[in-house]
Amino acid sequence: MKRKLCLILFLLMLVTCVTASGEAADWNYDANYGILRGYNGAGGDVVVPGELDGFTVDVIGVSVFRGETITSLTLPETVLELRSNAISTCDNLTRVSLPQSLVVINRMNFFSCTALTEVTIPAGVRYIGDASFRYCESLRKITFEGVCPAIDIDCFSLLPEGATAYVPDDQLDAYIAAFENAGSEVSVQPSGKNAVIVENNGYVESEFDFDASTGTITSYNGYATYLSIPETIGGAPVKAIGPEAFAQHTYLALLELPEGLETIGDRAFYNCETLARVHFPSTLKFIG
């Protein structure tokens, strides 16, 4: 009897080890950049871990869940960005939980996720790329929690009749305009709540190398996904962005340049391959 019990316990331990090992093998993770680059699991209900190999998961990479047989997806409170097509054509996906940390939903995310019935867009989201949530045939309820993000063309288009976006009362006009500009026919209605304000401008002044005498940012040493460059640094106005100042920053997806900026130097944003949207100020005079 004792031998049988020991054997059963041993087999249970073995199964547990195999399961844990299998879960670890589900992910293709780039620790150098905090990017989840691939999913090798069996589908079903999927919970993405906040850490892999001791490093945080900051970005869901291009096409990670494209066409996968997942039924629900929970993303951790570390994820800042969904890259292009990260989650799309998932025909069985009925539920998704997006984290409050999320800032950027890049183009074609949730495209043709035909079983998805509702979604909540967290307050920190600043940008939703083109064709995201397009052809979601069952999506009837979209809830926005924060200030109106930039919404690109064809987002939330070709949804079922009666699809409704519930938005903060104090942002109603902004959302109506954003949906109209995107070409969406979704009904935009007040949610009964005001916008949750999230301060995520993406910088600390020490991350900029700045020449105060000329007002020039000469380099940027941060890792922001969304960056709103300040009008002043150390009390001096920002007038120029120097040559190659932001070159090869692979995290940067959304950029707002400040009023007062006049010049952008040569190759200032060279090889920023994930940069999806830039807001230019009215004061800009020259781009190198």
Where are these regions (language model features)?
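Sec-dependent N-terminal signal peptides of Gram-positive bacterial secreted proteins and lipoproteins
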Residues: 4-22
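Short, surface-exposed terminal/edge motifs of secreted or surface/virion proteins that either
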Residues: 174-180
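A structural signal for leucine-rich repeat
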Residues: 111, 134, 154-158, 179
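Consensus positions within tandem repeat domains that build extended binding/scaffold surfaces
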Residues: 61-64, 83-86, 106-109, 129-132, ...
